[in-house]
Structure formats: structure tokens, C-alpha cells
Amino acid sequence: MGSEQRRKVIRRRATVLGSTGSVGVNTLDVIDFASRRGEAEVEIEALTANSNVALLAEQARKFRPRFVAIADERLKGELVDALSGEGIEIGAGPSAVEEAGARDADWVMAAIVGAAGLKPTLNAAKRGAAVALANKECLVCAGDVVMNAVRESGGALLPVDSEHNAIFQVFDFERPHRVARLILTASGGPFRTWSRDEMTAVTPAQAVAHPNWSMGAKISVDSATMMNKGLELIEASHIFPIPSERIDILVHPQSVIHSMVEYVDASVLAQLGTPDMRTPIASTFAWPDRSPCPSARLDFAALKHLTFENPAPDRFPALRLAREAVERGGVTPAVLNAANEAAVAAFLSGRLKFLDIAGVTAQVLDEVERRNGPARLTSLEEAMAADAEARSLAERLIAARDA
């Protein structure tokens, strides 16, 4: 009996939204690892990518999905040629990516970066899938809408971000009233020890060089500004039944303790591991079971020391902006996210200075609040409208700085 329990095979019909990005590639690595060891039997329903035809075609030939979608419609012909004779259904454009989210998978990795991931992820949630959520924007922009869809469909939301995944593993959902606070840990990014004066000259190349994690450019910049931690604060307030004022942020440069839960009896439970996204991905893939993962094991003897410090609000104003956004609620977090996305893109293209990312974001928040006042969020369309307004305003502010 014990042997049979140890050899229980995990069976999934899986979709990976954003399969060619960092999280998507790691997800397929986790699936491949478990499958080759006989721990999992996985049918791939759909894979999607934004524009990386070559990698999407390579993944499709290996994992044999029923459906693949490329978001950039101009690349459909190239993808059709690359998969000629493979017998795989091919779609292109945002509607095809949305279709991928609605297809019949019981486990969906939502790893499309940015607002583009909202509709396909919501489709998966409405259908009752277990949604492994790596897209911050879904909960930041439309948290109430997404969580309502999960509850109404009887599905599940499984956080992939290492911090939320850590809390998910040690949070007592049966007795949330016994939780005193959540502690989100942050590496502090590459500029943790830099003065504000030094940060005025930060280049895109420096900002994307994260000290611990391997991530995409946009997420790396968010880590450098600590906006990623601000967005995670907003996410956590949706995932866990804890008010935002009881969610703290603590800088932990080694990225070994991924987050903590403090209970009313002063006990603190933490999840530890090497800084490898495959660990939280494997946790969501096998949930509520566990499966082998190719991540390196933690060597406690080699750690020697773990350090902690409070974040510096004067050097990382994004944290204050995020707290203000979650307190205002409604569409304000969506405005924050859209303005930040536009500002980060401008920084990466050389149009905006590093410290101006938070400056532009703050201006957009204030202007939208002045125009519209507090606005409730009841639908994805309202979130998308706020997103569009914030992006347009951010672009005008960025252009004015260019002039």
C-alpha cells in the first residue's frame, strides 16, 4: 500500500499560456521531468506564445499539443510552415490566445506577461480549471473579477510567484483568523545598496541583471524598482483573506526564505528553497500532491547566514504607490499596473530614466484619481478601460519628458 501511494501517477490535461517565456519554458521542463520519471502522465491541450515562432514550433513538436496559438497574427504563416504535416491545430491573434484559455484543460499555467494575459486566464478560471497563476496583472488589475470566477466555477487558483506560493503552502485556510500577518520577502534587486544619486544613472542592462533569479526584462526591472513587490502585495490581498495592512514586506537578499506566515501564537512558518522557479511551478502542477522537480536541493550547511532588512521607501517609492493603490481599491491597481508597464517599456527603450518610472506612475495615478474619483471594479471591461486610459496618459507624460 505504501509503495502504491509513493508511486501515484499525476494525471493532467494541461495548457501553458505563454509557453516560450521564462515561466513557460520552466513549466514544460517540470512536466517533462515528471513525465520521464514516470511520475506524471500529461496531455498538452494548448501552448501559446507572443512572437517566438521557432521555440513554439519546437515545443509543439516535442509535447504534441492539440492546439497552438501565436498572438502576433502576422506570424501565422511562419508557424503554419514550421508545423506543416504535424497535425496540430494552429490559431493566431489575441482571440486565438483567448481560445487557448477556454479549451478543455484541467490545469492551466497562466504565464503571459502583462494585461494580454487577462482574458485567456479569466476564460480558464470561468471554466473551472486549476489555474496556476504566474501573471501578476490578473489579480492586480481584476482581482475581484478573477477570484469571483474561481469561486463560481469551483476551480482553484494556485499562485506561482515564489512568495505567494510559499505562503500558500504554509497558510491555514481553515483557520485564517489565527493568522497575525503575512511577510513577503524581497531580494531587494540589483540596486538594494545604491544611493538615490547612484540610481539616477541606472541603465537598462544593469536593471535586468537580477542578482538571484532568472527572469524576463520587464519583471527584472520591476524587481529593480521593487514594483514587483508592490504588485505582489496587491495580489496577496486577493489570494489570502488578510487585509493589506497586515501584509509586510521584508528585504532578504539571499532569496532562500520565500515568504512567511506569522500566527497569533507568535509562531512563524516559512517555505525555503533555492531561487528556482521550477520549485513553485512543480508545487502547483502536482497540487494537492507533490512531484519530483529538477531544482537544486537547499544545502543548509553552505548557507552560513541569512540576512533581513526593511526596504528603503525613499529609494523605492513604488512600494508606497502600491499600498495607496490597494487602499483606494476599485480600478486604481489596474491604473498603477498599466502606468508602470508603459513607463518600464519606455525605460527599456531608452526614453525614460530609471527613477522616472515611479514618477510617471505616480503622476498617472493622481491624474486618473482627479478625473474620475474612486471607481468600483465589477467587470473585466472596466479594468481594461482603466488600463487603456492609464497607458494613454502615461505615453503622453513620457512624450512630454522626451520633448
Model region roles, listed by residue range:
Residues M1-A403:
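Catalytic, metal-anchored helix/loop core of enzyme active sites in primary metabolism
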